[in-house]
C-alpha cells in the first residue's frame, strides 16, 4: 500500500465525515460554571446527509469529545464540550457565552477535525515516508537493543502470561500485549510501564489511547503500580496532557494532572469563537494575531510539561493534532525519536493510518488491546479507507513469537461463560485463572440462582416471538416482545430480593431498543438512577456485571451481518460474571452471527458416542447415513447438520465453537476406500 493510497483513503474519510451535527435539545441545566444539556435521543441532522434513518446513524459518540458547540436561539452563543455522557445523551459545556437552547431548540456541534491533522501528516512527505517504512516492522518485529530485564519482583501475584509480557515485550521494537476480556490487560500494562521507568532512569514514554477514559485508566494503572512497588519518586514524573479528563478519577492522584492555566484556556475558547467578519480586514488581522499569541502560550505550557515528564499520556487524537509539538522534542534535530517507547492502549480502536503516522515518535512501540473487540470507527465505504482506517495495527500482528503475548487467564467470567467466549472468539485459548478457581468466594459469587434459573445455569437462551420494527419516535430498530421480556426478567430478579440493581446490566446494539427498555423499566418503577444499567454494547467495553441481559433486536439487520457485529457480541457476552441471558427469535438463532453460539450451546453436553466419519463413508448410504449423528472428522468432533441436495457436500457443526465446516463427500469416500 502506497503513500498515494493512504492519502486517497484519508481524503475519502474526510469527505464522508460531516462538518457538523444538529441535535434537538430536551433541556439545559446550569451546574455552577458549566451547563448540562440533555439531547433528544436519536434526533440528529448531519451536514451533507438527508434527515432520516441514515442521518440517525451519526449519533452522539466519542468523535464529538472536545467538539465546539454553537446555537442561534434564544440568544446566539457558543461553548466547548468538556465531557460527554453518551448513555444519557448529555453534553457538559464549559465557557458558554450565553445560556444554551431550551426544549425543542437545536444545538450544533462541530467535531474536532483530527482527520485534518492526519491529512497534514500524510502530506508531510518525509515524515509520511518514514512512517510507511515502519509498516513491515508490525508483522516482522526486530529485537530491540539490549536493555535491563524486567523482573516484576514487587508483584508476586502476576500470572504466568503477565510475567512473560514483562520479560519479552520490552525486548522487541514492536510488541503486542493481547488482552482478552477479564485478563487484566490494563493492570499488566501499568506494571510493565512502571518497571520500564524504574529500570531505565533516562527513558521517556508516550502513552496514547482511543478515548479520554481509556487514557485515564491506563495512566492511573501506571501510578498504582509505582505506588504498590514503593517507587514514590517516579510518580511525579507521570503527566496527563489535555483538559478533558475525569477529575473524580484522579482523587488522591492530583499530581498526574496538567498545570495548564484555566484562565488561558477560557480566553482561548472565547477568542476562537469570536472570529470577525471576513470583510473587516483590520479586525481579522488583530483577531488572528491575538489567537496566534494565545496558542503559542498554550504550546509553551504543553512543551514545558512534556519536557519534564518521563511518561506523558494523552489521547491519540491529541497526539495527532499536536504532532508538530511532539516532533519538536527531538531537540538535537538529529531525526531521532523523541520517546524511547510509544504505547498504544486500546490499539484495536486506532486505525492503521493514525498508528503509523505516530510511530516515528518512538524508538519502540507497544500495542495493547484486543483485536476481537471494538474496531476503529469508519464512515467511508471506499476500499482504500477500509484498508487504512477500518483496520488497526493488530491486523499485522504476527501469529506467534516473542513479540506477541496473549493473556490467557481471566478472572471475570464463570467457567461456562468463559468456555463459550473462548471457543467462539479465541480458538479455545482463554481459560479461567487457577487462582480464581481456588477461591471459594469467587466461585460462590458466580453460583447464584436468578428467578427460575438455578445457580448452575450460566448461559441461557430465552425464545422471543414477535417481529422487530423501525421506530419513528426513537429513530431506530426496536422489538417490543424482547423489550417486554427483558423488563419482566429484571423486575423478577429485583423482586426476589437476592439481587441488587447495580448487579444487573441490559445490553443491546441499538439506542432505540435501549430507550424502549428504559421506558419499560420506568413504568415498572425501576429507575436507572437506582442502579440497573441499560446500555448499548458499544459503551460497555471495559465494564462488567454479575448478570447481563442481551437483546440483539433483529439479527437480520445489515449491521449485524458484519465483522464488527461479531466483535460486539464478544463484548456483550464477556461482560457477564455469573449469568448471561440472550433473547433470541428463531431467525436470530439461525443468523450467521448467532447460529454458531446457539449450536455450540446445544452440543456442549452431547454425550452420544462419537462415530468416525471415515467409517460411515464406507457405507453405500453415505452421506445420508451421517445426518444428525455425532461424528469425528480429523480433529473436529460435532454433528452432521445438513447435506447438499446433490449429496456432494455435508456440513459438520464443530461442537467446540459451533462453526459449520463444509466437507466433501467424495473425499471421505476415497479416504474410506484407501483405509479398507
Where are these regions (language model features)?
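SH3/SH3-like beta-barrel fold
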Residues: 93-95, 650-655
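ASCE P-loop NTPase helicase motor core
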Residues: 136-255, 307-431, 588
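Short aromatic-glycine-enriched beta-strand elements
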Residues: 35, 647-651
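Intrinsically disordered, low-complexity, charged/polar segments
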Residues: 657-676
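Conserved helicase motor core of SF1/SF2 NTP-dependent helicases
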Residues: 199-203, 317-319, 329-628
Amino acid at each position: 500500500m502506497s503513500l498515494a493510497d493512504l492519502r486517497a483513503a484519508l481524503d475519502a474519510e474526510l469527505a464522508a465525515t460531516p462538518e457538523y451535527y444538529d441535535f434537538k435539545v430536551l433541556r439545559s441545566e446550569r451546574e455552577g460554571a458549566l451547563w448540562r444539556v440533555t439531547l433528544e435521543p436519536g434526533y440528529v441532522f448531519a451536514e451533507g446527509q438527508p434527515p432520516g434513518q441514515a442521518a440517525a446513524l451519526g449519533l452522539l459518540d466519542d468523535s464529538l469529545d472536545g467538539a465546539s458547540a454553537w446555537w442561534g436561539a434564544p440568544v446566539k452563543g457558543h461553548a466547548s464540550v468538556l465531557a460527554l455522557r453518551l448513555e444519557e445523551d448529555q453534553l457538559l459545556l464549559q465557557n458558554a457565552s450565553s445560556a444554551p437552547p431550551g426544549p425543542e431548540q437545536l444545538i450544533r456541534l462541530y467535531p474536532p477535525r483530527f482527520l485534518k491533522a492526519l491529512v497534514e501528516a500524510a502530506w508531510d512527505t518525509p515524515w509520511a515516508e518514514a512512517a510507511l517504512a515502519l509498516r513491515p516492522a508490525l508483522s516482522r518485529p526486530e529485537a530491540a537493543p539490549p536493555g535491563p530485564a524486567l523482573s516484576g519482583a514487587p508483584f508476586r501475584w502476576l500470572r504466568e502470561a503477565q510475567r512473560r509480557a514483562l520479560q519479552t515485550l520490552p525486548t522487541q521494537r514492536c510488541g503486542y500485549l493481547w488482552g482478552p476480556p477479564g485478563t487484566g490487560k490494563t493492570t499488566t500494562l501499568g506494571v510493565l510501564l512502571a518497571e520500564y521507568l524504574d529500570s531505565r532512569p533516562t527513558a521517556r514514554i508516550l502513552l496514547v489511547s482511543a478515548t479520554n477514559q481509556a487514557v485515564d485508566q491506563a495512566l492511573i494503572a501506571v501510578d498504582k503500580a509505582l505506588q504498590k512497588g514503593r517507587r514514590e519518586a517516579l510518580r511525579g514524573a507521570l503527566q496527563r496532557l489535555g483538559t478533558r479528563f475525569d477529575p473524580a478519577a484522579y482523587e488522591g492522584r492530583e499530581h498526574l494532572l496538567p498545570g495548564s492555566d484555566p484562565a488561558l484556556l477560557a480566553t482561548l475558547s472565547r477568542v476562537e469563537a469570536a472570529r470577525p467578519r471576513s470583510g473587516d480586514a483590520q479586525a481579522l488581522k488583530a483577531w488572528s494575531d491575538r489567537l496566534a499569541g494565545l496558542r503559542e502560550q498554550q504550546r509553551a505550557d504543553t512543551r514545558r510539561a512534556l519536557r519534564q515528564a518521563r511518561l506523558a499520556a494523552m489521547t491519540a487524537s491529541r497526539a495527532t493534532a499536536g504532532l508538530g509539538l511532539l516532533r519538536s522534542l527531538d531537540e538535537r534535530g538529529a531525526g531521532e525519536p523523541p520517546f524511547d517507547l510509544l504505547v498504544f492502549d486500546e490499539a484495536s480502536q486506532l486505525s492503521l493510518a493514525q498508528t503509523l503516522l505516530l510511530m516515528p515518535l518512538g524508538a519502540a512501540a507497544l500495542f495493547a488491546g484486543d483485536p476481537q473487540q471494538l474496531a476503529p470507527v469508519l464512515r467511508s465505504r471506499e476500499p482504500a479507507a477500509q484498508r487504512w482506517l477500518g483496520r488497526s495495527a493488530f491486523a499485522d500482528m504476527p501469529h506467534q513469537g516473542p513479540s506477541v503475548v496473549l493473556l490467557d487467564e481471566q478472572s471475570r467470567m464463570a467457567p461456562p461463560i468463559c468456555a463459550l467466549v473462548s471457543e467462539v472468539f479465541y480458538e479455545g485459548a482463554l481459560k479461567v485463572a487457577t487462582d480464581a478457581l481456588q477461591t471459594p468466594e469467587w466461585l460462590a459469587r458466580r453460583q447464584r440462582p436468578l428467578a427460575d434459573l438455578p445457580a448452575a445455569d450460566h448461559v441461557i437462551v430465552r425464545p422471543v416471538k414477535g417481529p422487530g420494527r423501525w421506530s419513528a419516535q426513537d429513530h431506530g430498530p426496536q422489538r417490543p416482545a424482547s423489550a417486554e421480556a427483558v423488563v419482566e426478567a429484571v423486575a423478577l430478579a429485583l423482586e426476589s430480593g437476592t439481587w441488587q440493581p447495580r448487579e444487573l446490566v441490559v445490553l443491546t446494539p441499538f439506542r432505540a431498543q435501549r430507550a424502549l427498555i428504559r421506558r419499560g423499566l420506568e413504568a415498572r418503577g425501576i429507575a436507572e438512577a437506582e442502579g440497573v444499567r441499560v446500555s448499548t454494547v458499544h459503551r460497555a467495553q471495559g465494564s462488567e456485571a454479575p448478570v447481563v441481559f442481551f437483546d440483539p433486536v433483529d439479527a437480520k439487520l445489515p449491521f449485524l451481518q458484519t465483522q464488527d457485529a461479531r466483535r460486539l457480541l464478544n463484548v456483550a457476552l464477556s461482560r457477564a460474571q455469573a449469568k448471561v441471558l440472550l433473547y433470541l427469535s428463531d431467525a436470530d438463532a439461525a443468523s450467521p452471527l448467532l447460529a454458531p453460539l446457539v449450536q455450540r450451546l446445544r452440543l456442549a453436553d452431547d454425550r452420544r458416542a462419537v462415530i468416525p466419519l471415515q467409517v460411515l463413508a464406507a457405507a453405500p448410504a453415505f452421506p445420508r447415513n451421517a445426518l444428525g449423528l455425532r461424528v469425528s472428522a480429523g480433529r473436529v468432533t460435532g454433528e452432521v447438520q445438513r447435506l447438499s441436495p446433490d449429496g456432494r457436500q455435508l456440513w459438520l457443526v464443530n461442537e467446540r465453537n459451533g462453526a459449520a465446516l463444509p466437507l466433501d463427500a467424495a473425499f471421505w469416500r476415497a479416504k474410506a476406500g484407501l483405509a479398507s
